[in-house]
């Protein structure tokens, strides 16, 4: 059971921290773990309790806690959450709440394609000069589609038959 709790600890410790190795957890991720796993219920254990316990177990000048300190914090929160139970029973209940949990990303925005987005990104519906920027498959033409490329090889500016003069005279 403790190994499952340790896995959950490492998942939450690394959550949102690209530089974190997952061995130490900061206060933000500790609060998230307590909230997502149901340790913090809002009545007997509040966010204030979680912050106070975190501050108690961490070293004086540290900002993070290790798994060992985490276990102490969980014991203390468990005593408050499950009143009247033995410390071992409390620890089992807390580990049971944590089992198999992952950091939830509630409220995170997801990409959606609404009617306007479909209409604006469909290159077959483009008109005017924007139509020239894409080929039939919808792939962009690059700079050739964005700029008017002038061909200065003809006789005069509007001359279309460049390179055909020699063929006509012979």
UniProtKB/Swiss-Prot annotation:
Its domain of life? Eukaryota
**Could you tell me where the Basic and acidic residues compositional bias lies?**
129-149
Record localization: Cytoplasm, Cytosol; Cell projection, Cilium, Flagellum
Tissue pattern of expression reads: Expressed in spermatids. Detected in liver cancer (at protein level).
A Gene Ontology term for the protein's cellular component: sperm flagellum
Task: Summarize the protein's role.
Answer: Probable regulator of microtubule dynamics required for sperm motility. In contrast to other members of the family, has no microtubule bundling activity.
Positions of region (Disordered) = 127-170
Asked whether the UniProt record includes Cytoplasm among its keywords, one would answer yes
* Family stated for the protein in its record: Belongs to the TPPP family.
Name where it mostly resides: cytoplasm
Its protein name is: Tubulin polymerization-promoting protein family member 2
List the source organism.
Homo sapiens
For this protein, the record's InterPro entries field holds: EF-hand-dom_pair, TPP/p25
Gene3D superfamilies the record matches: EF-hand (1.10.238.10)
Entry's Gene Ontology BP terms: cell differentiation; microtubule polymerization; positive regulation of protein polymerization; regulation of flagellated sperm motility; spermatogenesis
Keywords, A to Z, come to: Cell projection, Cilium, Cytoplasm, Differentiation, Flagellum, Spermatogenesis
Record keyword Electron transport present: no
**Signal peptide positions on this chain:** none
Molecular function per GO: tubulin binding
Q: Which gene encodes it?
A: TPPP2
């Amino acid at each position: 059971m403790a190994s499952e709790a340790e896995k959950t600890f490492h998942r939450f410790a690394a959550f949102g921290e690209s530089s974190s190795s997952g061995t130490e957890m900061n206060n933000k991720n500790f609060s998230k773990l307590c909230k997502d796993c149901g340790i913090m219920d809002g009545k007997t254990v509040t966010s204030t309790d979680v912050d106070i316990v975190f501050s108690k177990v961490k070293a004086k000048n540290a900002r993070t806690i290790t798994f060992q300190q985490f276990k102490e914090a969980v014991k203390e929160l468990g005593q408050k959450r499950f009143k009247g139970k033995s410390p071992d029973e409390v620890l089992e209940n807390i580990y049971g709440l944590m089992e198999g949990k992952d950091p939830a990303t509630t409220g995170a925005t997801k990409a959606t394609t609404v009617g306007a987005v479909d209409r604006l990104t469909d290159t077959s519906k483009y008109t005017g000069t924007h139509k020239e920027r894409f080929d039939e498959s919808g792939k962009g033409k690059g700079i050739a589609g964005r700029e008017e490329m002038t061909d200065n090889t003809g006789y005069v500016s509007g001359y279309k038959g460049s390179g055909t003069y020699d063929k006509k005279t012979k």
